[in-house]
């Protein structure tokens, strides 16, 4: 593994290895602290978008492993005044051992990684959110023991979370169902890849059909438009019936897990009652962002 840009860059063995290392690092932290695996290492954390979990978990993780992490708002860089991305990549690659970037466009991240000369980690783009999906898989494995053969259902917008969870679940040997309105399907290349797994993948626009007998049901915010705007109102209409409610989850297994990458818009993609009923799972998932990201850093920078 040279970078972590999207889930399809990984092999099934690499996914398992990341989760195994994350388990080890989490156990060590609970016992008093992680070994200084990043001593003498520097990590740039570039953010072009607001963040709570990604920023803080990377900052804490780098600190816990003895490294130096620098948070950088990209609006403060010369790139915000017209310096070419390729120049920024080649400069930061001379200063830092690794770069984490949360940005808008996946193609910018890919270009940056091709030129930086150091490992680059995707902190969220319009196409992929691999760190979050690794945390999801870690949480499922912690609570259910195994991933292979379990039914994972994603309900929501076919954006970065859907793209990444589909691929991540399939790499882990899960049966994956994606439930989206037809106008909000995942990326075409993700669907093409997923269908190569045959009966292990299913796409539907029927939420009840999708969650039927699911072991795990995941969702994410699907209305990011400003409240009251035409786009927001259109999305509210388009996603009628796609909210995770107690009624919808009656079709899933009685002990089904519910995951949400946060932040949550209660009353839109998930009801308040369902969120609170599954809060322990959801906040374990949030905590595990820290541990899987530490694992990725340890693998990329310390040869774990």
Question: Model segments located where?
Answer:
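Anion-binding alpha/beta catalytic cores of soluble intermediary-metabolism enzymes, centered on
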Residues: 90, 97-168, 260
């Amino acid at each position: 593994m040279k970078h972590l840009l999207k889930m399809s860059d990984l092999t099934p063995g690499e996914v398992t290895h990341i989760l195994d290392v994350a388990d080890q690092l989490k156990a060590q932290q609970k016992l008093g602290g992680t070994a200084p695996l990043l001593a003498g290492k520097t990590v740039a954390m570039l953010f072009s978008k607001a963040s709570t979990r990604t920023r803080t978990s990377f900052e804490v993780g780098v600190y816990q492993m003895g490294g130096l992490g620098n948070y950088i708002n990209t609006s403060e860089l010369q790139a915000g005044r017209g310096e070419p991305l390729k120049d920024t990549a080649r400069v930061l690659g001379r200063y830092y051992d690794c770069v984490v970037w949360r940005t808008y466009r996946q193609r910018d991240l890919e270009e940056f990684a091709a030129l930086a000369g150091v490992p680059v980690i995707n902190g969220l783009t319009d196409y992929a959110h691999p760190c979050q999906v690794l945390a999801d898989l870690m949480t499922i494995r912690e609570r259910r023991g195994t991933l292979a053969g379990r039914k994972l259902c994603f309900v929501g917008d076919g954006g970065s979370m859907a793209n990444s969870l589909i691929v991540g679940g399939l790499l882990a040997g899960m049966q994956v169902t994606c439930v989206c309105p037809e106008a909000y399907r995942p990326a075409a290349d993700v669907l093409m890849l997923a269908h190569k797994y045959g009966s292990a993948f299913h796409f539907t626009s029927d939420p009840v059909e999708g969650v039927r007998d699911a072991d795990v049901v995941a969702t994410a915010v699907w209305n990011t438009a400003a409240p009251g705007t035409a786009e927001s109102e259109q999305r509210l209409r388009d996603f009628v019936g796609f909210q995770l409610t107690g009624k919808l989850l009656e079709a899933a297994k009685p002990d089904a897990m519910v995951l949400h990458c946060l932040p949550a818009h209660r009353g839109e993609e998930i009801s308040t009652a369902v969120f609170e009923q599954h809060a322990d799972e959801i906040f374990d998932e949030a905590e595990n962002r820290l541990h899987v990201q530490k694992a990725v850093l340890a693998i990329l920078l310390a040869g774990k």
